[in-house]
Amino acid sequence: MRYIVFIITFFFLLNSYSQDTVYARRVIKKLCSKELLGRGYVNDGVNKAATYISKELKTIGLAKFGKSYSQSYSFPVNTFANSMSVIVNGKTLTAGKHYLIDPRAKTVKAEFQLFKKDSLTYEANDGRRPAPLKVKLRKKLTYTVATELSDTTIVELLKDSFPNELKTMDVIFENKFVSNFKCQNLVSYVNGTQQPDSFIVFTAHYDHLGAMGKDAYFPGANDNASGVSVLLNLAKYYKKNPSKYSIAFIFFSGEEAGLLGSRYYSENPIFPLSKIKFLTNLDLLGTGDDGIMVVNATVFKEQFEKLKQINDSKNYVKKIKQRGKAANSDHYWFTQKGVPSFFIYTMGGIQAYHDIYDVEKTLPLTKYIEVCKLLIEFNAKL
């Protein structure tokens, strides 16, 4: 009888939990707002995002390991905070839409004659080697973050916008290299009811690419405001329904700069890594039309089978694909230190990625609730 009551209660809680997509939308919209400028390094966007997440954790009522949720660290990063201009063949281009500046670039204020090297590459040839400017035509513009500088400026142009041969390019922008940008991870938890010294850990990075000049910023709805919203929703669930194990929620910065926040944390853990029973890293959770991918599935086969069995029974997602070990997100450093871990992301749907089009308005959240339910049931079987 007690078992039946437990099952009924468990699924009632899951159904109640499933109603909170409104909260998910609110979180994603805030994280993608112009106020936070892509959660990067212009106007301290990433730390403004940390302040917002910390307030949410406090409102939910999550515990701290110390006086605050914050774990501070720093790293170098290149930024473009001021206005920029790129004119090609006399046509003024729009930042983010028509062009990207290499994130490693130094200040440039010059006009260049362009010479075609091949079908997708042009160079400015003023006698210097290497050439001071390279222009690359791309089918899609995909931005990133740089922690170092380059002597050659690369400008990427959207290929479909330039059917004719390039002749001239007028480029104006300023960089500011910050050698010691202060950033933070956020760490919180819900105490376990039976084995509080053992932890189930959820992680997600909250940083993104920030801004490129004054006219372009990268909202990062799918990458990874979606994952942050899942962690906050799971935090709300476990605060009301504690597990027998403690549940920790870690929000990393510096992921887009090279998994820097998670690396720092893995080398300076707030609680012993040996206490982690399992870690699930979540990123790109805004779609799911084609199911989910589980990185490390071939490493931790027993846990993967548990996850797969749940989905085979409940049909939460179309399919669960498996990959082996990969250094493609914040789970990596934990795997390297012997912590059993998965990295889960959704597949299919929108194609916006590391560009100005990854926005809250078009993020479908196709299998958002189903993935959350799958995670809750998976944790219950660990």
Kindly give the residue locations of the regions a language model identified.
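Soluble metallo-hydrolase cores and metallopeptidase-like ectodomains found primarily
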Residues: 106-109, 137-219, 236, 244
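His/Asp/Glu-rich mid-to-C-terminal helical/loop segments that flank catalytic regions of hydrolases
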Residues: 236, 351-382
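Active-site metal-coordination/substrate-binding segment of hydrolases
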Residues: 93-120, 126-130, 197, 203-230, ...
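Second-shell loop/turn segments in exported
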Residues: 34-44, 59, 71-74, 174-176, ...
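N-terminal capping segment at the start of a domain
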Residues: 20-48, 60, 65, 69-70, ...
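Bacterial Sec-dependent N-terminal signal peptides
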Residues: 1-22
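Noncatalytic luminal/extracellular "stalk/propeptide" segments of secretory-pathway proteins
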Residues: 37-128
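Metal-dependent peptidase/peptidase-like ectodomains
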Residues: 242-243, 252-352
